[in-house]
């Protein structure tokens, strides 16, 4: 698949806000319902660091296969090139920050 610079049109979330956006680094806040997810994808250049504010997240990762559950206050980083899927593992909305950098942002969706 081809890398995309803006992935906001590819999947629905309850809310998306950017708190910091500068060359090579950004901080986004996302809120997803229990039925929403961020589909399988990877980034060529940036690491994703997730920080849960409310609710709970479940991350599925490949290479190697791994499953991570995060509660409020917990973090997890996904290295560039590692495929991952982000889901809400709770019964209410989940809100989290994702710190993305250092490098040029891209999003490579998988089918």
Model-derived features: where do they sit?
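A short, N-terminal "cap"/entry segment at the start of jelly-roll beta-barrel domains
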Residues: 1-28, 39-40, 108-111
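Glycine-centered loop/turn positions within well-structured domains
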Residues: 38, 47, 76, 84, ...
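Short, conserved beta-strand element in jelly-roll/cupin
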Residues: 32-33, 44-59, 101
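Ligand-binding loop in jelly-roll beta-barrel domains
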Residues: 80-106
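Short acidic-glycine-tyrosine-enriched beta hairpin
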Residues: 64-80
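Short histidine-centered beta-strand/loop micro-motifs
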Residues: 17-20, 30, 38-44, 61, ...
């Amino acid at each position: 698949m081809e890398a995309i610079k803006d992935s906001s049109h590819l999947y629905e979330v309850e809310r998306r806000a950017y708190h910091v956006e500068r060359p090579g680094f950004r901080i986004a806040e996302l809120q997803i319902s229990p039925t929403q997810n961020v589909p399988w994808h990877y980034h060529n250049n940036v690491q994703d660091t997730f920080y849960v504010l409310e609710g709970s997240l479940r991350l599925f990762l490949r290479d190697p296969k791994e499953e991570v559950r995060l509660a409020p206050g917990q973090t997890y980083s996904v290295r560039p090139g590692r495929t991952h899927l982000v889901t809400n593992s709770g019964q209410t909305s989940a809100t989290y920050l994702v710190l993305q950098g250092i490098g040029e942002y891209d999003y490579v969706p998988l089918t």
